[in-house]
Structure formats: C-alpha cells, structure tokens
Amino acid sequence: MTRVRIDKAGLGRGIYITGHCANENSGSAEATLVCAAMTTLAQTIAQNVFDSEDTGDTDIIDVTLRSGQAVISYVTDDDGLNTAVDGICKGFDMLEENYPEYVSCYRGER
C-alpha cells in the first residue's frame, strides 16, 4: 500500500508519500504500473517545485525522492505552481479511486 498525505497551511505545502504498491503483490503487473504512476507524479511535482525555486518564487523546505518515500515540502505564493501541483495531485486521487487496494490519500488543510 502506498500512502499519500497532502498538507496545505498558509503558503506552505507538503506532499508525503510512503510505501510500495508492487510489494503488495510482487507478481502483479497492475501493482507495478500503479507504483510507476505514483513515482512519475511525485517526480513531476518535484520538478515543478525546483523550476519555481529557480525563478525565485519558491523556498524549498525538503525534496527527498527515494525508493518507497517521497517528501516534497515548500513555501510559495506562486499561484502557477500551486495550480500545477493541485492538478498533478488529482492524479493521486484518481489512482486511489481506481486502485484502492494500492493507494490511500489523505488531505489536510489548516
């Protein structure tokens, strides 16, 4: 099971992903594809955050991408970045809706 937590607090954002879909059923091509989709979404968010930092619009708190874990946290007032990340995060929601045995999402806002 892969768990995704998406937090929003003021100008701060955090996306925390833990787990592996493929480990649930190591022989499942479906689990492998879902895990690959999760990885692609996380890497896309990270790249958008890095691009926004390069323009001076975002302060990165942490970007860690490794097997079974992703942490992406940042502070920004860049509406374009926030819109892009919100759109990408809809991909996590869609994966949870279609593959609840592999993905669990939680959203927190303060």
PLM regions and their residue ranges:
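A short mixed-secondary-structure module that forms the rim of ligand-binding clefts
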Residues: 35-38
